[in-house]
Amino acid sequence: MAVTNIAELNALVERVKKAQREYANFTQEQVDKIFRAAALAAADARIPLAKMAVAESGMGIVEDKVIKNHFASEYIYNAYKDEKTCGVLSEDDTFGTITIAEPIGIICGIVPTTNPTSTAIFKSLISLKTRNAIIFSPHPRAKDATNKAADIVLQAAIAAGAPKDLIGWIDQPSVELSNALMHHPDINLILATGGPGMVKAAYSSGKPAIGVGAGNTPVVIDETADIKRAVASVLMSKTFDNGVICASEQSVVVVDSVYDAVRERFASHGGYLLQGKELKAVQDVILKNGALNAAIVGQPAYKIAELAGFSVPATTKILIGEVKVVDESEPFAHEKLSPTLAMYRAKDFDDAVEKAEKLVAMGGIGHTSCLYTDQDNQPERVAYFGQKMKTARILINTPASQGGIGDLYNFKLAPSLTLGCGSWGGNSISENVGPKHLINKKTVAKRAENMLWHKLPKSIYFRRGSLPIALDEVITDGHKRALIVTDRFLFNNGYADQITSVLKAAGVETEVFFEVEADPTLSVVRKGAELANSFKPDVIIALGGGSPMDAAKIMWVMYEHPETHFEELALRFMDIRKRIYKFPKMGVKAKMIAVTTTSGTGSEVTPFAVVTDDATGQKYPLADYALTPDMAIVDANLVMEMPKSLCAFGGLDAVTHALEAYVSVLASEFSDGQALQALKLLKENLPASYNEGSKNPVARERVHSAATIAGIAFANAFLGVCHSMAHKLGSQFHIPHGLANALLISNVIRYNANDNPTKQTAFSQYDRPQARRRYAEIADHLGLSVPGDRTAAKIEKLLAWLESLKAELGIPKSIREAGVQEADFLAHVDKLSEDAFDDQCTGANPRYPLISELKQILLDTYYGRNFTESDVAAVKVEIPAVVKAEKKAKKNA
């Protein structure tokens, strides 16, 4: 049934829709059979279709259209015959993904008069390959040729098993019918090839569209180019089908030193150099009413000369206008779609590229540009040209008409007769259109657990008296210069001498930096880094508790990488492997050794450090496995004289490390055992270590080991909101870190032990709330529960043990009892809550907190109350930045 009106078009769409629904269920084997049969039929009809196109449109050259028809069938088939376009495209068992292809549906194919048959063949074939249907809106000047090409492909497809109405067309095209087709509700995609007006109409239709537009291809010929090849290529391309290919050359810009040689070569090989009145006459016929004169499109050079009122030999290949102006006032500077060519002289390569940029911007932005140069010896020019040209195809030493369509002069450029121009040209794609653009891809993503890790120092030496033995490794590894980083107390009391004496005896030069204080500052760290830069150690030894080890780690970073920006190092991350800022590689200049003299921080085995900017008061918590020491020395002889308060605070810090690591969303079977063993050692030995001190060296040693074991656990499983809040309490009110954790941990357990939390932290392996069960497992492991106890009872017994332990270690019952004034606390609690939420530790907590919930925990802990869920709803949080903005808005109003 012919399509000549809206009703007939609607009926066609209905038939095509039915056919496409059937075709959408075909297998890859069936589709490939149809694709091959259709390509064979189109190739077989290449000559009659070419003759028909020229006869009907009055444009182009039969022999060249034969090549285009052959290309559209043979090259397209060869390029895509093995491409999977149906069903499962790929399956990745490792990452658990399946990619499935689905057809788009019905495509509206817009076909230009310049390439009426080859474009129809191309679009039909890629539609068939992707299980789509297509309805063509041909150009009125070439409708019969376009529709015949479509019919040949359709009949071959039907003979190979395709549904009978899979390809359709408008028999009597009009603007009304073309618009109706583009806007039809059953059209799923517009595939438009044509001039700017048609492409704009496609993109304005409200439908997904792939459209291409005008080209205004400039060619730069530099002084290193092979002139004979350059001229031959331009002539071959520009005369191909009388220049109707949109990628064909429109201007040549020649460097001055070879301009005359290029000019002479054109003149002696069929190029006609327009002189005087001839140039003006051709300029006058190129444009008509400010637009390209359709009368010259696809016409031979001698006919265009006749239109201009003069004659040239019939053998003339192209008309060349030597012009100077590079703007819209110059007709030769426009796209001409005919064997007419502008020729510009450039003073040098840079000037030539600048002119080419302007020509592209005038009317061919996004399409194609070309450079003739010595591509083997001028890579910088090739790169520069590529950077400057805003075109999707940048061809080197290539005839643009044949090169732009792909697979002829470069075999990785996809073959296509629809060339995307990207956003520059108002297109949605910037590559040569192919089957991949006509399918929807579905991704089936199976749940997969994150790859986890267990990272430790290369060596961990432990047991009483291990320090001098472990230092033998420094000597045997050939280190010659050791920088010891410690605090003044340890230095004055001879702890550093225990290291320097061993090293000096072996001929290792030593230097001691002992200015580290609690909460190390950037100024102190920079001072230590300056010493490192002058002393040039090949090993840095941190001696002390958390502060000297933190300072030493950061000095290590500054020594190895002085260009480091701490704001970037401290940037929060959701996944340490995907962080925006990548830590630099460490250990190039020096090895890091950590010798711990306290039992709590675990810093000797962790990738964490904290530094305070003393100019702003801003704390920078750093976390990266690059900061993990190369060696840890855990010698309990160094903690025998540790004061009771430090024993208590450090011990409860270690308890908190183990508790938070065990319930963390990153907890694994590798970290669980260490967390549980650390808790067992601490339960059995911390009271004795606190009460008996050096009189019970076994208890002191086991607590010391437990702190390091807990450090290993949280180095890999990370921590939670107890540490998030403790960091902020310590910073604001100068509460010792271990004490802050001890004050908060019971209420944090009450908060986390909820099987139906407000929000669960999103982490693949953490598939449901587990904290409640895991706290109960801790109680079981510590022997706190009895057979028959329910989960709630086990958690209460765990809390009872913690409260009893804290009481025995002299821990205050509340933040208020720890000496924080109520007015001061309440003035800062909102900011503390927000800052705790933003702490790096928060992300691994099993329960993703609301800021109001953190505020409630802080308030309850301040007053010594047990946290309960029901209290949270009444809590209002005033975020300082928001309050400030609201006040400013009211003031401005």
Predicted features by range, described:
Residues 452-539, 815:
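ATP/NTP phosphate-donor binding region
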Residues 24, 310-450:
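Conserved C-terminal structural/oligomerization subdomain of aldehyde/semialdehyde dehydrogenase
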Residues 3, 121, 199-327:
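ALDH superfamily catalytic-core signature
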Residues 88-229:
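Rossmann-like NAD(P) dinucleotide-binding subdomain of oxidoreductase/dehydrogenase enzymes
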